[in-house]
């Protein structure tokens, strides 16, 4: 059985090694700032203590006031899981950094989130629709989507 990594230990190590202190502990996950995503993701993948080589999934939740992007990470080496979350408060043109350069498996998942929720992943090399046709208007899984 895979063990959920202690969020407190994870936050402490990130704060110690990267100096990021504005990280919130959400019981089973950590909430990070958008601008810190790439640094933290790279750190979690490349630090032997964590070794999160696998991005299991990315999803997005529309809470109306903000979008929450959720990253599920897995370390096969340590048999541990971790969940990163970040929030995007811009409904007009939401965007977050792409993690494709860190975890190539993020490519299709980021495109799906763009297609259905309208969240742009900056620095993504192929940000186009994946499920709907290019001329489709809007993003149908947004709570403010109207036909």
Segments (PLM) and residue ranges:
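Terminal low-complexity/charged segments
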Residues: 1-147
């Amino acid at each position: 059985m895979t063990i959920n990594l202690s969020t407190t230990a994870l936050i402490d190590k990130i704060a110690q090694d990267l100096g990021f202190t504005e990280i919130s502990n959400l019981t089973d996950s950590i909430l990070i700032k958008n601008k810190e995503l790439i640094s933290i993701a790279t750190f979690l993948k490349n630090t032997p203590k964590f070794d999160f080589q696998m991005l299991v999934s990315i999803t997005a939740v529309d809470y109306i006031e903000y979008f929450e992007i959720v990253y599920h990470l897995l370390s096969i080496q340590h048999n541990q899981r971790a969940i990163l979350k970040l929030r995007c408060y811009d409904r007009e043109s939401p965007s977050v950094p792409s993690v494709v350069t860190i975890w190539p498996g993020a490519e299709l998942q980021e495109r799906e989130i763009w297609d259905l929720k309208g969240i742009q992943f900056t620095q993504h090399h192929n940000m186009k629709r994946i499920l709907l046709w290019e001329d489709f208007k809007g993003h149908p899984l947004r709570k403010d989507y109207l036909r």
